[in-house]
């Protein structure tokens, strides 16, 4: 994972205070604290056994956090999504999460293989980059922050790159 910068973590805190329920969540009626603590240990974070929520974990990292179990999104805390509402994806498999993105059908078709690679302990962690063109320079691209301005020139457009780091975790209690 990336070293966490204080100003970035503060921006995450502000965004969570503003839009918290739409940015994060977990599958209802599931105690995910053991999985969250397991992830915190794997990431070598300070005080991993004190983490009780996905927000606790996310506020220790620059990266947004999604936890998949058995191919389903169990918990998420994405403070700066690109025009989507993270909490709406809870309980969905990887393919369904990405149905509405560019080239979504290709991604949906490849999702079983992608999910397998993402959980492959032998492969270990990997980093990938996702890009988009947007009409706002703001870090938060949440749908509630939509910029109504229509770009007129190329100078009105912004290139946005997201870093995604995948870290497969060893199974705990029969789940991964």
Predicted regions: what is each one?
Residues 1-176:
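Extended, well-ordered protein cores
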């Amino acid at each position: 994972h990336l070293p966490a910068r204080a100003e970035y973590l503060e921006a995450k805190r502000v965004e969570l205070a503003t839009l918290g329920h739409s940015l994060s969540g977990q599958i209802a009626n599931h105690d995910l604290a053991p999985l969250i603590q397991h992830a915190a240990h794997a990431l070598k974070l300070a005080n991993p056994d004190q983490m009780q929520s996905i927000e606790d974990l996310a506020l220790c990292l620059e990266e947004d956090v999604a936890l998949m179990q058995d191919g389903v999104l169990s918990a998420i805390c994405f403070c700066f999504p690109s025009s989507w509402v993270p909490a709406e994806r809870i309980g969905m498999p990887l393919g369904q999460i990405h149905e509405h993105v560019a080239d979504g059908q290709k991604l949906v078709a490849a999702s079983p293989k992608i999910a397998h690679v993402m959980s492959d302990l032998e492969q270990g962690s990997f980093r990938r980059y996702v890009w988009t063109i947007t009409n706002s320079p703001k870090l938060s691209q949440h749908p509630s922050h939509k910029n109504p301005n229509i770009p007129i020139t190329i100078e009105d457009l912004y290139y946005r790159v997201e870093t995604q780091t995948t870290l497969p975790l060893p199974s705990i209690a029969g789940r991964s």
